[in-house]
Amino acid sequence: MKIILNKIYQGDTLNISETYTLFKSIMLKKINNIELSAILIALKIRGESQNEILGAVKACLEHMITFPKPTYMFSDIVGTGGDNSNSINISTTSALVGSACGFKIAKHCNGNISSKTGSADILKKFGINIQISPEKSKKMLDELNICFLFAPQYHINFKVVTQVRKILRIKTIFNIIAPLLNPAMPKLTVMGVCNFKLMLPIAQVLKTLNYHHAIIVCSDNIDEVTLHSFTKIIELKNNNITSYILHPDDFGVKYCHKNDILGGNTEENYNIIKKILQGKGPSAVTETIAVNVAILFKIFGYSNLKKNTEYALKVIRSGKVYEKIIQLSKF
C-alpha cells in the first residue's frame, strides 16, 4: 500500500490492479481520514485516469448490497454532480418525467454532498420514501416504472468516505464513479459529467462494464443537456463509441439563458420542480427537462429528438407527472 500511496503523491497514474487494491482498502476502512483526504485531493489535482475509474468501480461494486435483477430493460439517468452550476435537480426531474412517459427507471440517488441539494433531498420533500428494502423498490419499479436506490443504503462502506467528502466540499473521484455504482446494474444509462475530458474515459469504462447503450452528456461544464449552450454527446451503442454535438434546434426548442435553470436550496428547488411537474413551470426550464428526457428516449430506441421532446413536453404540461409523484408518495 505504501508503494501505491507514494505513486499517487508523486503524481503518477495507477493501473487497474493498484486502484482496485487501494479502493478495496478504503472500503475495508484500512485507510484513515487524513490519508483518504490526501488521496482524493491528489487524484483531483492530477486528474483521474480511465484505469483508475475502472479499478475504483470494480472494488466498490464488490462491497455493494445487491438489487433484485429485473427481467426487462431499464435505465438510469444520473449525473456526477459537483459542477457548481446551482441548477435545479434536472436528472431527478427528468427521471420522474421519463417514468410517466412509460420508461422504466432505476434512479441511483444521494443527498447533498458536493452540491446544495441532492436528488434524495428533493424526493424526501415530495414525501417519497427512498429508504425501503430492495424487494419493495423492485416492486415500485415493476408497478410505477421508477424506483429510487439511496446510495448509503446499498453502499454501507461509504459512510467514512461521505464524512470526508462533506468536509472537503469538492468534486472527487467518488462523484465520477457514483453514477457507475447503481445497485440495479442497468445496461442502459444517460450519464451527465461536468468535464468534457471525462467523457471518453467514462464511455470506455461503460463499455468494459458491458453497457448496451449509454449516452454521456456535458454542456458548458454542466452535467446535463442545457439550452444556453451546445451539448457534447458521447454515445456507446453495440460496443461502438461515437461523438457529436447537439444544439437546442436539434430538439426543436430555442436557446435560453443560463439563469433560467438556476435553483437554490432544497426548499427552492422543490417549489420550482413542483410547478414543472404540475405543468405550470416556466417554459425555459420545462423545455430543459424535456430535452434531457428526449435523450433518455433515445437509449430506449426512439431516435427522433424533436418528436421525443414534443412528447415529453406534452406529458409534462398535462400534469401527469405530478400524479405519479402522489402515487410514489403513497407506495
From Swiss-Prot:
Q: A Pfam family name for this chain? A: Glycos_transf_3
Record InterPro entries: Anthranilate_Pribosyl_Tfrase, Glycosyl_Trfase_fam3, Glycosyl_Trfase_fam3_N_dom, Glycosyl_Trfase_fam3_N_dom_sf, Nuc_phospho_transferase
Textual note on the cofactor: Binds 2 magnesium ions per monomer.
Q: What is this protein called?
A: Anthranilate phosphoribosyltransferase
Its organism's taxonomic lineage begins at: Bacteria, Pseudomonadati, Pseudomonadota, Gammaproteobacteria, Enterobacterales
The residues that the entry says bind Mg(2+) 1 are S91, E224
Name the GO terms of the biological process aspect: L-tryptophan biosynthetic process
Task: Name the positions where 5-phospho-alpha-D-ribose 1-diphosphate binds.
Answer: 79, 82-83, 87, 89-92, 107-115, 119
